[in-house]
């Protein structure tokens, strides 16, 4: 993209100038529609989510055997929702603003197996592929007890096949660990941002880790090429996969059940705001789709991105989607939020979800570190930097009168609001790494 194009983009979308200056910005989507209007553009519906949910239920007996830590939830990979009222008080004090309603944290950071939101989509896509291969080979039927997959016989069957994926870290962890457990040969192509401990953990599980000095897009492309050269190799495409997307979407119905158990009502007078950190977009996009299907127009999904990697905001704001990367406008895509270090958003997710997302904001690395330190101090919960991107959301929303007015959000409704921060990772960060993170937090 040449300077003339950039000048034209800035003329058309003045917000881009601030983004290029790495300022924290927010943008609330003027093109949002109702679920009914926006759903046809997704190309998926509740039947697809139900199918994903049923598949995960079929695999539950296997998961209990393969990963005993999932026995407590009967082989279903799910995380807790906790209220963080001390954090809410601290945020109100620091930002001198009153957050109406309650503040909750969704602890995907502490999901079993890989300790991140990617345990949803990544594991689901590996299981889907394994099921398809086994059914095609007539060694498995849908009515079988899937715990039979936890045998040497099946490990040997899956070992003829391989799986490849490109990742900044967390997706590679979930896909690598799951694939290796089933018996697949698996290669994870890791971008320059990937943390060393994640690579070491994967290698300990027998995963082939391929390292690059370039960013996420290069790692994905190399993974794609590996699969193209081998008919028995399956490439998990984080940029375009509907299967990954559906693995995440199951979270919506499950959250609804958790809210029911907690007596939390979501309706027109009791709105739900959900703040989701966004990298390439598959995880937050899939979760947001599931939330919309579960709560309809009463849930407001807002994506949070690092100031250095605002790829989904850039793609949806300009309507160019994956036709533009942050590097095209001079942003470096280098951030401490390694899980969000993506320069070019998923075109599939952007086009599918652009009418169903309320807004976007960007957050600096230092602010993520500061919030990480604060959450640890007042709630005793430790997350990785990218998982804190959503924590600023309630402040951004509360301070945006124009947006609240546009969605007819009266003060009476806001008092009853639930603000949910989706914590995307950090539960498996080694203590020495966590110390480094905490040392970067401001007092």
Swiss-Prot record:
GO terms for biological process: D-serine catabolic process; isoleucine biosynthetic process. GO terms for molecular function: D-serine ammonia-lyase activity; hydro-lyase activity; pyridoxal phosphate binding. SUPFAM superfamilies: Tryptophan synthase beta subunit-like PLP-dependent enzymes. This is Probable D-serine dehydratase. InterPro entries: D_Ser_am_lyase (IPR011780), Ser/Thr_Dehydratase (IPR050147), Ser/Thr_deHydtase_PyrdxlP-BS (IPR000634), TrpB-like_PALP (IPR001926), TrpB-like_PALP_sf (IPR036052). Gene3D superfamilies: 3.40.50.1100. The keyword Kinase does not apply. Keywords: Lyase, Pyridoxal phosphate. It catalyses: D-serine = pyruvate + NH4(+).
């Amino acid at each position: 993209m040449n300077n003339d194009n950039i000048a034209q983009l800035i003329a058309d979308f003045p917000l881009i100038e601030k983004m290029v200056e790495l300022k924290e910005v927010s943008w609330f989507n003027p093109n949002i529609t109702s679920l009914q209007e926006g759903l046809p553009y997704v190309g998926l519906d509740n039947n697809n989510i139900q199918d994903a949910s049923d598949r995960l239920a079929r695999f539950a007996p296997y998961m209990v055997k393969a990963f005993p830590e999932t026995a407590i939830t009967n082989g279903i990979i799910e995380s807790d929702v906790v209220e963080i009222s001390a954090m809410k008080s601290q945020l109100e004090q620091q930002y001198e603003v009153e957050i109406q309603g309650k503040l909750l944290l969704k602890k995907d950071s502490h999901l079993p197996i890989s300790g991140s939101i990617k345990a949803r989509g990544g594991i689901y896509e590996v299981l889907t592929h394994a099921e398809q291969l086994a059914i095609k080979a007539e060694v498995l039927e849908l009515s079988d007890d899937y715990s039979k997959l936890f045998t040497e016989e099946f490990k040997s069957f899956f070992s003829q096949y391989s799986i490849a994926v490109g990742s900044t870290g967390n997706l590679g962890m979930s896909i690598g660990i799951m694939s290796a457990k089933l018996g697949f040969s698996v290669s994870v192509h890791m971008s320059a941002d990937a943390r060393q401990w994640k690579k070491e953990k994967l290698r300990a599980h027998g995963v082939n880790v391929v390292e690059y000095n370039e960013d996420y897009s290069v790692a994905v492309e190399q993974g794609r090429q590996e699969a193209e050269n081998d008919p028995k190799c399956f490439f998990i495409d984080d940029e375009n996969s509907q299967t990954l997307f559906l693995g995440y979407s199951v979270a919506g119905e499950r959250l609804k059940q958790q809210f029911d158990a907690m007596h939390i009502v979501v309706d027109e007078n009791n709105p739900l705001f959900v703040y989701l950190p966004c990298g390439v977009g598959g995880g937050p996009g899939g979760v947001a789709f599931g939330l919309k299907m579960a709560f309809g127009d009463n849930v407001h999904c807002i994506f949070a991105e690092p100031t250095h990697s605002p790829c989904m905001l850039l793609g949806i704001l300009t309507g160019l989607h994956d036709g533009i990367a942050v590097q095209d406008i001079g942003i470096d895509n280098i951030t401490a939020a390694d899980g969000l270090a993506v320069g070019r958003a998923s075109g599939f997710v952007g086009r599918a979800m652009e009418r169903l997302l309320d807004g976007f904001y960007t957050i600096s690395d230092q602010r993520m570190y500061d919030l990480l330190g604060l959450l640890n101090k007042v709630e005793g919960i430790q997350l990785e930097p990218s998982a804190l991107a959503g924590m600023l959301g309630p402040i951004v929303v509360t301070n945006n009168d124009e947006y609240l007015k546009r969605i007819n959000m009266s003060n009476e409704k806001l008092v009853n609001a639930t603000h949910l921060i989706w914590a995307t990772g950090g539960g498996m960060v080694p203590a020495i790494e966590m110390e480094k993170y905490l040392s970067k937090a401001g007092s």
